[in-house]
Regions:
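Hydrophobic h-region of N-terminal signal peptides that target proteins for export
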Residues: 9-17
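Secondary-structure end/capping motifs
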Residues: 220-304
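Surface-exposed patches in mature extracellular/periplasmic domains of secreted proteins
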Residues: 59, 100, 158, 240-244, ...
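Pocket-lining segment of extracytoplasmic ligand-binding domains
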Residues: 165-258
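Short, glycine-/small- and polar/acidic-enriched structural segments
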Residues: 20-154, 158-162, 167-173, 177-183, ...
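Positively charged n-region of N-terminal signal peptides that target proteins for export
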Residues: 1-4
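Conserved C-terminal helix/tail region of periplasmic/extracytoplasmic solute-binding proteins
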Residues: 291-325
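A bilobed periplasmic-binding-protein/Venus flytrap-type ligand-binding module shared by bacterial periplasmic
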Residues: 40, 110-119, 209-224, 278
Length: 325
């Protein structure tokens, strides 16, 4: 009888906690919802880290490009958003008070994959390359990779193709001669006979790629919520990095992205064997990584000199309050 009473009390306590959970809407691009870039969020959901922190977390699909993820913070669609640093910087320079509160991905690895007949960079001269947003860091890094291998902007044509899945389709249908692909779509393409020419990391130093952003005004008014979110995400990063949890992480990747088991294994091996610092240890923000992202934007012409300081786009108080940084 005592055991039954204890169980009922526990159930009531859990229901009360759930009813008092703080709602938190997180904006995520449609193109990233079933990608590796959503992994930390899905792990935090599946492992109950948001619930543990007293958050009623929901992921809100946001159509459009990176700019729209910032707009979602201003039009009431989302409280926080996944966003690439390039779009955050441009929005802040245009007057947004959006700021990075925790890192999601560093040092992304994009493969430049081409049709089989393109055996070298020289073979891409005059060809069509499907690229991500012109002002984004993916395109900047791929243009730099091409330049390092003898191809200047006038040597090839480009077409905007948003998202790795659509770029893979552009390649496989024959519309594009080469495209940058993230994981595991690069593995898929190579298994189909397409040719790897190089990696974005061959051309650019490590930089801060994606972050969770919030408006300064909203974050300041909801500091406890932001800190709870940061703690939950930190737990997810630690879980992903724990080799003893590898099978569970692989299952999450397969279930949420549609990757095959083999491609999920290849992706984690690429990231962690050896550790290429693609994911932060606990969501910490690298000031140097943000500086490198800004420098890359300057090199690509996305922003003009004098370049802004990294601190303008980062607010570390939430990571500090969570005991992470």
């Amino acid at each position: 009888m005592r055991a039954i009473i204890a169980a009922l009390l526990c159930l009531c306590a859990c229901q009360t906690a759930a009813s008092q959970a703080i709602p938190l809407r997180y904006g995520q691009a449609y193109s990233a919802l079933r990608s590796i870039f959503a992994l930390p969020l899905f792990v935090a959901e599946r492992e109950g880290y948001f619930v543990r922190e007293g958050l009623d977390f929901s992921m809100v699909p946001v159509p459009g490009g990176g700019e729209r993820l910032i707009w979602a913070l201003h039009d009431g669609t989302a409280d926080m958003s996944h966003v690439a640093t390039a779009f955050l910087v441009q929005a802040a320079l245009a007057g947004s008070d959006a700021v990075a509160v925790v890192a999601e991905f560093n040092n992304p690895i994009y493969s430049l994959v081409a049709k089989p007949e393109n055996k070298s960079y020289a073979d891409l001269k005059g060809k069509l390359i499907g690229v991500a947003a012109e002002t984004g860091s993916i395109t900047a890094s791929i243009r730099k990779l091409l330049a390092l291998n003898g191809l200047q902007r006038d040597d090839y044509r480009t077409r905007f193709v948003d998202g790795t899945p659509d770029r893979l389709a552009c390649l496989t249908t024959g519309d594009c001669d080469a495209v940058p692909l993230g994981q595991p779509h690069d593995f898929v393409a190579m298994r189909r006979g397409f040719r790897l020419l190089g990696l974005s990391t061959d051309a650019v130093p490590e930089y801060l790629y994606t972050v969770t952003a919030a408006r300064r005004s909203w974050a300041a008014a909801n500091k406890d919520t932001v800190v709870r979110y940061v703690r939950a995400l930190a737990s997810a990063f630690k879980f992903i990095r724990d080799s003893a949890r590898r099978a569970e992480v692989l299952k999450t990747i397969v279930d949420t992205t549609g990757f095959s088991q083999a491609n999920a294994e290849l992706t984690l091996a690429l990231y962690f064997e050896p550790d290429r610092r693609v994911l932060p240890k606990a969501g910490e923000i690298s000031i140097n990584g943000m500086e490198q992202a800004i420098a890359l934007m300057g090199e690509s012409g996305a922003i003009k000199a004098p370049l802004p300081t990294a601190e303008r786009f980062i607010d570390l108080q939430y990571l500090q309050a969570a005991g992470i940084q």
